[in-house]
């Protein structure tokens, strides 16, 4: 008869695990090779920083700074991370603002990208959005297919996002349907590459 306790988890006395062994990179000169299905979004990979303007019918307009990091680990998806902070009239930081994490995934036919994309985006405010979209040149356009909210999250029902690389800068515009309003312009920004 074995000395193992069937109620004891198998990992309880296992040796420690080494750090995560796979590299993720926002710099195409280092790290893993970009998956061929991501070639159409190669210009997006990097670290971007800049400023934007936001507003909505239920809030006052505001200026913000933002950093977006788009990275990969060699598999056919991009990791998207955004953090923003409010700016005063002299462009000084006031406080942290929106944060978002997500993944951009090409729709594949075999191993080849079709030009259609899926994006999964989550926020710490309890909203998760599933976007479907298309890439045209260096432009990427997404619209929500579904929005899931925690019971305490703000009522967000739809979104639309347009990203583009214009003269080396990352530009985007975001519309949102929330708290009883239809799709309405919410955010727009211009960011320059600061890494990658």
UniProtKB/Swiss-Prot annotation:
One Pfam family for this entry, by name? THAP4_heme-bd
Residues bound to heme b: 186
Skewed-composition ranges (Pro residues): 7-19
Q: Where is this region: Disordered?
A: 1-29
Report the SUPFAM superfamilies cross-referenced here.
Lipocalins
Q: Which domain of life is it from?
A: Bacteria
Segments carrying motif GXWXGXG: 46-52
Cofactor dependence: heme b
Q: Which UniProt keywords apply?
A: Heme, Iron, Isomerase, Metal-binding
Q: What is an example of a GO molecular function annotated in this UniProt entry?
A: metal ion binding
Instruction: Name its pathway.
Output: Nitrogen metabolism
Give the record's cofactor note, including how many are bound.
Binds 1 heme b group per subunit, that coordinates a highly solvent-exposed Fe(III) atom.
InterPro entries, A to Z: Calycin, Nb(III)_bact/plant, Nitrobindin, THAP4-like_heme-bd
User: By its UniProt entry, which HAMAP family does this protein fall under?
Assistant: nitrobindin
UniProt family annotation: Belongs to the nitrobindin family.
Subunit-structure text = Homodimer.
Known role: Heme-binding protein able to scavenge peroxynitrite and to protect free L-tyrosine against peroxynitrite-mediated nitration, by acting as a peroxynitrite isomerase that converts peroxynitrite to nitrate. Therefore, this protein likely plays a role in peroxynitrite sensing and in the detoxification of reactive nitrogen and oxygen species (RNS and ROS, respectively). Is able to bind nitric oxide (NO) in vitro, but may act as a sensor of peroxynitrite levels in vivo.
Quote the PANTHER family the UniProt record gives.
PEROXYNITRITE ISOMERASE THAP4, THAP4 PROTEIN
Q: By what name is this protein known?
A: Peroxynitrite isomerase
């Amino acid at each position: 008869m074995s000395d193992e306790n069937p109620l004891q988890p198998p990992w309880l006395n296992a040796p420690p695990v080494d750090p995560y062994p796979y590299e993720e990179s926002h710099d195409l000169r280092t790290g893993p090779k970009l998956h061929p299905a991501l070639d159409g979004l190669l210009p997006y990979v990097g670290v971007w920083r800049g400023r934007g303007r936001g507003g909505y019918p239920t809030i006052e307009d505001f200026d913000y700074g933002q950093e977006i990091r788009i990275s990969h680990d060699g598999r056919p998806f991009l990791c998207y991370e955004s953090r923003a902070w409010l700016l005063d009239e002299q462009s000084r930081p006031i406080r942290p603002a929106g944060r978002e994490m997500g993944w951009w995934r090409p729709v594949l036919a075999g191993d080849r990208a079709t030009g259609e994309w899926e994006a999964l985006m989550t926020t710490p405010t309890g909203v998760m959005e599933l976007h479907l979209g298309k890439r045209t040149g260096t432009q990427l356009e997404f619209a929500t297919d579904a929005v899931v909210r925690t019971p305490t999250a703000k009522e967000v029902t739809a979104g639309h996002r347009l990203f583009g690389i214009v003269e080396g800068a990352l530009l985007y515009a975001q519309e949102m349907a929330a708290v009883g309003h239809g799709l309405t312009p919410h955010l727009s920004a211009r960011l320059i590459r600061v890494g990658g």
